[in-house]
């Protein structure tokens, strides 16, 4: 809890499977998963969605932004599903765009932004619902080394606020910026 952790391993080692289990997107056959003091085994989709919404934020290599929505609309989207009014969700989304240094880009579409800007919008979207844990799947994989360092600096700042961050990465220099690294081989932690 409160750490920034890298998960590394070769292709097929189980990194994505682990992230999907932690994100309550896939079930698991053995072991125990406790989130916020509650066991996660055997959750139905509705209960899993509730836990995801309340405790988890996701950041993906491909950003997963909605192309026809502006930066502020993309960031505000999780709040829409929480039934927050448009005025309030836009104000909150702008607060998070400021946090990631993109307040001037609020009305731009994803195709008008660089990869680093898109990733920062994705991070703001992950943060807007105030998760306890951020799950990041190759968050720097599509970025150049300078932008990767900027994104990692931002993630470290977020981590200092007490948010646990789990990063799947192939990049050793990214893992070196984390508190610890978990190595996976054939689905096992080594």
Predicted region positions:
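ABC family nucleotide-binding domain
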Residues: 1-184
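Conserved switch/coupling elements of ABC/ABC-like ATPase nucleotide-binding domains
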Residues: 186-190
